[in-house]
Curated annotation (Swiss-Prot):
Protein name, per record: Glycine cleavage system H protein
Cofactor(s) named in the record: (R)-lipoate
Similarity annotation: Belongs to the GcvH family.
Organism lineage string: Bacteria, Pseudomonadati, Pseudomonadota, Alphaproteobacteria, Hyphomicrobiales
PROSITE patterns xrefs: BIOTINYL_LIPOYL, LIPOYL
Length: 120
């Protein structure tokens, strides 16, 4: 199930694990990404904590943790090649996997239709 935040993160939910990245809209606003800093595996975050950083030719931006949980994996490929985020932000450009503290919290996030309305 795909969910979104008002801060332009996407989550692909699989049970109690969410794969997290930034949306195509966010990438279009940032421009070409040149640097990514990811969180440590095993680190716990609360909703809206700064979890990662992206830098583009235009600006630096925080990527927020969309829900309470623990980082179980990070995408090292985007650290080596940040352009993967530009070319496939909602696929190969994922940032981290988050084991959710409470799966039901995801119900409060935006669905795709609501997110598209937000960015329209």
């Amino acid at each position: 199930m795909l969910k979104f935040t008002a801060e332009h993160e996407w989550l692909e939910l699989d049970g109690d694990v969410a794969t997290v990245g930034i949306t195509t809209y966010a990438v279009e606003q940032l421009g070409d990404l040149v640097f990514v800093e990811l969180p440590e595996v095993g680190k716990s975050f609360s909703k809206n904590d700064d979890a990662a950083t992206v830098e583009s030719v235009k600006a630096a931006s925080e990527v927020y943790c969309p829900l309470d949980g623990e980082i179980t994996a990070v995408n090292d490929a985007i650290v080596a090649d940040p352009s993967l985020i530009n070319s496939d932000p909602q696929g190969a450009g994922w940032f981290f996997k988050l084991k959710l503290k409470n799966r039901a919290d995801a119900d409060g996030l935006l669905d795709e239709a609501a997110y598209k309305e937000l960015i329209a």
